[in-house]
Amino acid sequence: MAVPKKRTSTSKKRIRKNIWKRKGYWVALKAFSLAKSLSTGNSKSFFVRQTKINK
């Protein structure tokens, strides 16, 4: 099993953590955008079946 030779510096740790957070931010933004387009009916990639409620 691979063992690190030296301890990772705080700055490098912080940089990696920020990259990880940034990726999560963009994924969440894209998901929110898709949900918004689905709710308004402007989505071109999903077909949503419209159901009408009879009263």
Curated annotation (Swiss-Prot):
The keyword rRNA-binding does not apply. Keywords: Chloroplast, Plastid, Ribonucleoprotein, Ribosomal protein. It comes from the Eukaryota. One of its GO terms (cellular component) is chloroplast. The keyword Kinase does not apply. Coiled coil: none annotated. Pfam families: Ribosomal_L32p (PF01783). This is Large ribosomal subunit protein bL32c. It comes from Solanum lycopersicum. The gene is rpl32.
